[in-house]
Every structure is written in structure tokens, then in C-alpha cells.
Amino acid sequence: MIEWHEFSEERRGIDPDERGFQYGDGLFETIAIRQGEPRLWDYHFRRLEAGCKRLALKRPAVAALRDRLGTAIAESAHDSDSCIAKIIVTAGVSERGYGRATPTDPTIYVGVFPATPVNQPAYEKGVATILCETRLAVGSPVAGLKTLNRIEQVLARSECLPTGAFEGLTLDADGRLICGTMS
């Protein structure tokens, strides 16, 4: 189970008018935590910052976000030697409709959950993979961003489960290999 920490001055819980909930208007980063420290923190923060810029979201301050992450890890009941953190930055609450007519204050959520280790034989012998039928969009303005709207990835990953495959490989509409469903 994920333990969520919301860092908003005004509310607790998810507001139904939250743009992240309504439209997938936001970003996320999933970060491995080892010995209580986020791995590749600078990389993850730079990618989150670049995504905020591309989506015209107010960027969180690095020190404040790092402090919030540290608080969530410290307060978590999960083993901080090996767990996972997920940071979600949404566009916050605004008027109804796709457009953000007025600037919004982002909402930041930090979740901490147990890491699922890959068993040793998988490292030694490899894992079963499939080529997913679901194709990823070509030329999307959000390509490369970890947006909250991940329906293509959800559909592709759902193809793996009935087959028992550990990983699914996804292609774009032009047949080029893009990524794995988990990697």
C-alpha cells in the first residue's frame, strides 16, 4: 500500500476539481530509495523541472521538494533501505474545461511504497517478454514526459499480465522500438 503525503497549504485529500484527477494534467517521477536516499535525485528533479516547464506548470523548488521527499521517507512505515517514492505534481484546482485560463497553484503528492525486488534468477537467465500490440503515439508534444495520462502504457502493460510476461516492449506507430512497459 502506498502512503501518500500531500503538500498543500489549503486542503487534504484529492479535490474532485483537481486537474490531475480530471484531465491527467500533471507529471510524476518514480524514484528508487536506497539507505533512505533517493537514487539519481538530480536526474529525476531535472526531468520533473523540464516537464513542468513544457506543461507550463509552476516548478517546485528543489530544496523544498527534496525536504518533502525526506519527510515522506522518514514518516513511512516501509523499509527505507529499499523502497520506492513517487512524486506527483499536478496543475492543481482550476475552472472546469481543458484550458487553464488562470494560473494555478500546483499540488504536490509524495507516495512511498515497498520495492518489489526482481529475483536473482531473472538477473542470471533473463525474463519473458512480449511485443505489445498497443502502439505509442508518434510526434506527441508530451513524448518523453512522465505525464499523469498514461493510458497507452496502461493498455500495453495490461497485455503482459495474461501472458505471464515480465516485460512488454512497445513500438510507436511507425514500428520503432520505444520502451518497455516498466523500463
Stretch-by-stretch model annotation:
Residues 1-169, 173-176:
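Conserved alpha/beta cores of soluble small-molecule-handling proteins
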Residues 179-183:
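Glycine-rich phosphate/ribose-binding loops and adjacent secondary-structure elements
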